[in-house]
A protein has these predicted regions:
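Glycine/serine-rich anion-binding loops at beta->alpha junctions
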Residues: 89-105, 141-148, 280
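A glycine/threonine-rich phosphate-anchoring loop and its flanking beta-alpha core
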Residues: 11, 21, 113-212, 308-315
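Gly/Pro-rich interdomain helix-loop hinge
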Residues: 280, 284-359
Length: 390
């Protein structure tokens, strides 16, 4: 019997080479006054930033432009919102990575309401957002967060009392997601690696999540197959390999859909305090913590062969295996080793490179949530996972 489940709406999706050229046409659906948010680096080095701005201006669009240089903070969002609240913006367009997507989503949601975004953040503010927003169009330049598919914007403040919290409402899903793999060709190698590991983590965590359903399972498994086939190729050949970029773009898109409907697990549980207390990029946290967390997860589930998560981990292990016709335990052991190998090949930085050390382990463990992870790890296992990445 299939358990009941709920699947909410998705953006209009325009996927494929050259789809960025649809932007002027779709912008006009909402009006001619556009607030464009972009990242600070690769999009401009590639020439796509100038290309997109020229196309919008050539179509008679009144363009305002803001650069997002880092993960959005409450002060960043509040400042942009105050600048444009009285400007009759018709549509917000975000062209960039996950941070730009989150910033665009947050700005589009905050322009119509009063007060600081802090007042509406989950677990921090006391107000419930009414869901009003300016229409939002997402055009990602990385294959990672899948934020172009999600209903939340992640907002961070780094420091001793830092946090990573979400602004969330069903209405915050972008109206249109334009996913053009050509936009990813110029993505730097290091960012390709860490963004790819974020997508990988989201797919695996949502696949084995306690909230998974048949639709998220189908998308997550296909996304994981794409990760197996294309992640390393995008890392090694990404500047010229449009097939690998397309495969990773689809995997990231699927990861955004599955995390929205099935939730995430312990790796993302670690990401909240690590990203709040230290200036560690989100993809680095995922890339660092995935192998140790899932090694302990497999160990804790090994005596539960009928557990749905255990059965799914066997399926994923077979997807990533380089052999056939072995026992399940051999596949699972191979998958643990494969995760370590991928982390090494992608040259994922250690957490210590960002100031994290032994003395911070208890604080991180204390503030980490298991979310929808299929099994609890002990405090000792969580500490060991962190320690392995110092």
């Amino acid at each position: 019997m299939i358990d009941s489940f709920h699947f909410s709406s998705l953006p209009e999706i325009r996927f494929g080479k050259g789809k960025r050229n649809d932007l002027p046409q779709v912008v006009k659906i909402y009006g001619r006054n556009v607030l464009l948010l972009t990242g600070s680096s690769s999009i401009h080095y590639s020439g796509h930033g100038d290309e997109i701005m020229s196309a919008l201006k050539g179509a008679g669009i009144n363009l305002s432009h803001e650069v997002i240089a880092h993960e959005p903070s409450p002060s960043m969002v509040d400042e942009i919102v105050e600048t444009y609240r009285a400007s009759d913006i018709d549509v917000v367009v975000a062209v960039g990575g996950g941070s730009v997507m989150d910033a665009g989503k947050a700005v589009s949601a905050m322009i119509p309401v009063e007060g600081s975004i802090r007042m509406y953040l989950e677990g921090l503010g006391e107000k419930e957002h009414p869901g009003d927003k300016i229409p939002f169009i997402a055009l990602p330049t990385t294959s990672g967060t899948g934020s172009e598919m999600t209903k939340n914007a992640v907002i961070s403040e780094v420091g001793d009392h830092g946090f990573k919290k979400s602004l969330r409402h069903n209405n915050f899903i972008p109206e249109i997601a334009i996913i053009d793999p050509e936009m990813m060709l110029s993505c730097p190698t290091k960012l390709t690696a860490t963004a790819g590991m974020d997508a990988f983590t989201q797919l695996l965590e949502s696949y084995v999540s306690r909230q998974a359903n048949p639709m998220t399972d189908a998308l997550a498994l296909q996304g994981l197959k794409n990760i197996k086939k294309y992640l390393l190729r995008a890392f090694l050949e990404g500047e010229n390999n449009i097939e690998a970029r397309s495969g990773m773009a689809l995997a990231a898109m699927f990861s955004g859909i599955t995390l929205s409907h099935a939730g995430l697990g312990l790796v993302h549980g670690f990401a909240s305090p690590l990203g709040g207390y230290f200036h560690i990029p989100h993809g680095v946290v995922c890339g660092s913590m995935m192998a140790p967390v899932f090694a302990h997860t497999i160990d804790n589930l090994i005596d539960q062969p009928d557990n749905p998560a255990m059965q799914k981990l066997v399926i994923v292990s077979k997807v990533f295996a380089d052999f056939k016709y072995k026992k399940d335990l051999e596949y699972l052991q191979s998958f643990k080793e494969k995760l370590l190998h991928i982390t090494s090949l992608l040259e994922v930085p250690r957490l210590s490179e960002y100031g994290f050390g032994e003395e911070s382990i208890p604080k991180i463990v204390e503030n980490t949530s298991h979310k929808s992870h299929p099994v609890k790890l002990t405090t000792e296992q969580m500490e060991a996972s962190l320690r392995s990445r110092i």
